[in-house]
Amino acid sequence: MMAEPEESREPRGIRLQKVLSQAGIASRRAAEKMIVDGRVEVDGHVVTELGTRVDPQVAVVRVDGARVVLDDSLVYLALNKPRGMHSTMSDDRGRPCIGDLIERKVRGTKKLFHVGRLDADTEGLMLLTNDGELAHRLMHPSHEVPKTYLATVTGSVPRGLGRTLRAGIELDDGPAFVDDFAVVDAIPGKTLVRVTLHEGRNRIVRRLLAAAGFPVEALVRTDIGAVSLGKQRPGSVRALRSNEIGQLYQAVGL
């Protein structure tokens, strides 16, 4: 059989700037500038040629060091979990759970699962995805992805509490530490504090603050790594932006 003439063969792959544009990174023209400026890597190598073609199914593409997700079957969502709702996709006892909420708002929820949990009486940011590798790494303590909370505690918080929490407090299941602590606001009998830590043990923020002498009255998770709750309303769901996904990948070494 005669070989197909070289000039008639279709070039393999898709132009890199088109791939970046389809991934929502930038317009095609802006993506071209990113490539020329040396901000784009393909499979570990900086690419500056605009004619470069890639196979989105196998190529690992990064912009400014952050990985670009090219698989359009992958879903990444941010949920503001309301207080009183359980962090499960279904509940045998008929209690309200995030699965009920997601089912009403997002199609194809059977393939989605939640990254970690929040107590029923805690509200705030949760991530949902069908990207198993990313979810596994985000939940694994070795990657130490920071999480930030706003906690309303009983009492007036002294200046030295942050130093105490950074040094660590011994709990029943071992010592616990915070990465950052700040007083946000105070009213008679209550204080609003911001706590950042990378631990994921059960009710860790509540137990840590209670052990320090300041029981938590209300708790909201506001940040997971580069993803912030912002002005997202309780019960609302949004798709993560490309840069947020890329920074999560970067945080866990993908």
UniProtKB/Swiss-Prot annotation:
InterPro entries: PsdUridine_s_RsuA/RluB/E/F_cat, PsdUridine_synth_cat_dom_sf, PsdUridine_synth_RsuA/RluA, PsdUridine_synth_RsuA/RluB/E/F, PsdUridine_synth_RsuA/RluB_CS, RsuA_PseudoU_synthase, S4_RNA-bd, S4_RNA-bd_sf. Pfam families: PseudoU_synth_2 (PF00849), S4 (PF01479). This is Uncharacterized RNA pseudouridine synthase Rv1711. Was identified as a high-confidence drug target. Its EC number is 5.4.99.-. SUPFAM superfamilies: Alpha-L RNA-binding motif (SSF55174), Pseudouridine synthase (SSF55120). One of its GO terms (molecular function) is RNA binding. Signal peptide: none annotated. One of its GO terms (biological process) is enzyme-directed rRNA pseudouridine synthesis. Residues 14-81 form the S4 RNA-binding domain. It comes from Mycobacterium tuberculosis (strain ATCC 25618 / H37Rv). Belongs to the pseudouridine synthase RsuA family. It catalyses: a uridine in RNA = a pseudouridine in RNA. The keyword Signal does not apply.
